[in-house]
C-alpha cells in the first residue's frame, strides 16, 4: 500500500510540475478578473492598486515591472504559452499593444476589483461591468482587424477565463461595515454568485462559448491573513478558508445548472482551492522552503507600494517562496497552479 501511495505521489508531482501543452486548439484567451490575472491595466487608471515598479517583475523577461502582482509571470501567461499562443497575455489598456497583439489573447482584469461594484469602489478600479464594456469594444476592433466572419469565429472559439472574488470578502465584506450589515456571509455568497451568473450569461450572449469560471483559493492562508491571525502562531484563518470552500460549492452548482440553460455553451468551474492547499500543506514536495511568509519585505503585510525597491528584508530567491507579497503567489507558484488547472479544466474545451 505504501508503494502505491508513493507511486501516486510521484505521478501527481509530475503532473503538477511539468509543462502542459495544448497547442493549436484555441485561437485566443480572453481574461476577466482581479489581480490574479491583471497584467497591468491598473497602470492606466487613477488608482493606488498598482505594481508597475520594482521589485515587482524582477524575474519577468528583462526584469521589467509590468503591473503584474508577481515577481514574474502570472498563471494566465503560462496558459497562453501552453496553448501555443504568445508567452504572455497583454493588458487591454496598455498602449504599447494593439489589436494584432490582442487577437491571440487579452486581459481586461483589474487588481483589487470584485464581483461586487462596492469592492471595485474601494480603490477606484475597473468593476466587472466596465471590463465587459471594454470587451465589447475589443470585439468591434477584432472584427475590423480579422474580418467579420473570422472575427466571429475567433470570439466563439476562444477560451474565456474568469478569476475573481477574493477581494469581495477580504477587502470589502470583512474590511468595511457596509455589506456585512446588509448580508450574512451565506447571503453575500449568494449575492456574488448571482452576479457571476449574470456575467457569464452576458458573455454567452456576446458569443463566448468556452468559459471557465474560477473559484477562490484558500484565502485564509495568505501571509497577510496569517500575520493578523493573532494568537495562533501564524496559522491559516480557518473561517476564511471555510468561506472559500462554501462559495466554491455554490459557484460549482451554479455553473452546472447554467450550462444546461445556455445553448451551445461549454461552461466549466475551475477550482484552485485543492491544488493550492496541497502546496500549502506540503511545500517541500514542490521545492518551496517558505509558505507562511512572503518574499517581499517582511513577508507579512506588504503588497503594492509596501513592496519597495531595495527593501533589505526582501528575499533573494523567490522560487523558495510560495507567496511573492502578502497577497499574491510567486511566479513559480503561478506556474504550478497553471499546470494543475490546465490538467483539470482544459480537456473540457479541446
UniProtKB/Swiss-Prot annotation:
Localization (cell): Secreted
Class of this enzyme: hydrolase
EC number: 3.1.1.-
Gene Ontology biological-process entries: lipid catabolic process
Molecular function as annotated in GO: fatty acyl-[ACP] hydrolase activity
Recorded superkingdom: Eukaryota
Entries under InterPro entries matching the protein: GDSL, GDSL_lipolytic_enzyme, SGNH_hydro_sf, SGNH_plant_lipase-like
Active site: 35, 325, 328
Glycosylated position list: 98, 117, 343
Gene Ontology cellular component terms for the protein in this record: extracellular region
Annotated keywords: Glycoprotein, Hydrolase, Lipid degradation, Lipid metabolism, Secreted, Signal
Signal peptide: 1-23
A Pfam short name: Lipase_GDSL
Family (UniProt): Belongs to the 'GDSL' lipolytic enzyme family.
Protein name in the entry: GDSL esterase/lipase At2g04570
Taxonomic source organism: Arabidopsis thaliana (Mouse-ear cress)
Taxonomic lineage: Eukaryota, Viridiplantae, Streptophyta, Embryophyta, Tracheophyta
Amino acid at each position: 500500500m505504501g508503494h502505491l501511495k508513493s507511486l501516486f505521489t510521484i505521478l501527481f508531482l509530475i503532473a503538477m510540475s511539468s509543462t502542459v501543452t495544448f497547442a493549436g486548439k484555441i485561437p485566443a484567451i480572453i481574461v476577466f478578473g482581479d489581480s490574479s490575472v491583471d497584467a497591468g491595466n491598473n497602470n492606466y487608471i487613477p488608482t493606488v492598486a498598482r505594481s508597475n515598479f520594482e521589485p515587482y517583475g524582477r524575474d519577468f523577461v528583462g526584469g521589467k515591472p509590468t503591473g503584474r502582482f508577481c515577481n514574474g509571470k502570472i498563471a494566465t501567461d503560462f496558459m497562453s504559452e501552453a496553448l501555443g499562443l504568445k508567452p504572455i497575455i497583454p493588458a487591454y489598456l496598455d498602449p504599447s499593444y494593439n489589436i494584432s497583439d490582442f487577437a491571440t489573447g487579452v486581459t481586461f482584469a483589474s487588481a483589487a476589483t470584485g464581483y461586487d461594484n462596492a469592492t471595485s469602489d474601494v480603490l477606484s478600479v475597473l468593476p466587472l461591468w466596465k471590463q465587459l464594456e471594454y470587451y465589447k469594444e475589443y470585439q468591434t476592433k477584432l472584427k475590423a482587424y480579422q474580418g467579420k466572419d473570422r472575427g466571429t469565429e475567433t470570439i466563439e472559439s476562444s477560451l474565456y477565463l474568469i478569476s475573481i472574488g477574493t477581494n469581495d470578502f477580504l477587502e470589502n465584506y470583512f474590511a468595511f461595515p457596509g455589506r456585512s450589515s446588509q448580508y450574512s456571509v451565506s447571503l453575500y455568497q449568494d449575492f456574488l454568485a448571482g452576479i457571476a451568473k449574470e456575467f457569464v450569461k452576458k458573455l454567452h450572449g456576446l458569443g463566448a462559448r468556452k468559459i471557465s469560471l474560477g473559484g477562490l483559493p484558500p484565502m485564509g492562508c495568505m501571509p497577510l491573513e496569517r500575520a493578523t491571525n493573532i494568537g495562533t502562531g501564524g496559522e491559516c484563518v480557518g473561517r476564511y478558508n471555510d468561506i472559500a470552500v462554501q462559495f466554491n460549492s455554490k459557484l460549482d452548482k451554479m455553473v452546472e445548472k447554467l450550462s444546461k440553460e445556455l445553448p451551445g455553451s461549454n461552461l466549466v468551474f475551475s477550482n484552485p482551492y485543492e491544488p493550492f492547499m496541497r502546496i500549502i500543506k506540503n511545500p517541500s514536495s514542490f521545492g518551496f522552503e517558505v509558505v507562511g511568509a512572503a518574499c517581499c519585505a517582511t513577508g507579512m503585510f506588504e503588497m503594492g507600494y509596501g513592496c519597495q525597491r531595495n527593501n533589505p528584508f526582501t528575499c533573494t530567491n523567490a522560487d523558495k517562496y510560495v507567496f511573492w507579497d502578502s497577497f499574491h503567489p510567486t511566479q513559480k507558484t503561478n506556474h504550478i497552479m497553471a499546470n494543475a488547472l490546465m490538467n483539470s479544466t482544459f480537456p473540457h474545451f479541446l
